[in-house]
A protein has these predicted regions:
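Conserved "landmark" site that anchors the functional core of diverse proteins
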Residues: 1-135
Length: 135
């Protein structure tokens, strides 16, 4: 599951699940994230999941890297644990003033506009994260 656990500065550790970005690895990251969060482990003050990593930040006045690493290494995650996924429908406007690359796609794919939109709208997309990044 976790390929490597290393320190990230003085008060955080870095759980590395590998370099690939896919739903399987991401679900392992999220399951570990949720398990640690639910356990409410003393000293852990922040959890930051990404596509294939989890950062566990902790309070050095309460705990240390060695203790948190041992806890993380020994956490049991149920493979059958269900993730709290939601299916969202996001409205999309495909007016020609917004679909600036449609002509290029028509030529490249040898499809007309309607065929391209049909392919696009008949596909489900997996969203790894939502939110905003500062900057």
């Amino acid at each position: 599951m976790i390929k490597n656990i290393s320190n990230l500065g003085d008060a955080a550790l870095y759980c590395d699940f590998g370099t690939e970005v896919n739903k399987d690895i991401n679900s392992k990251v999220i399951k570990l994230f949720e398990t640690i969060r639910e356990k409410n482990i003393e000293g852990i003050n922040n959890l930051t999941p990404s596509y294939n990593k989890l950062i566990v930040s902790f309070d050095l006045k309460i705990t240390n890297f060695k203790k948190i690493k041992e806890i993380v290494e020994n956490i049991q995650i149920k493979e059958t644990q269900k993730l709290n996924n939601k299916k969202l429908e996001i409205p999309v406007c495909c007016d020609s003033s917004f679909s600036l690359d449609i002509e290029r796609l028509e030529k490249k794919l040898n499809l007309d506009r309607e065929q391209i939109l049909e392919v696009f709208f008949n596909k489900e997309f997996f969203c790894y994260m939502t939110g905003f990044i500062a900057g």
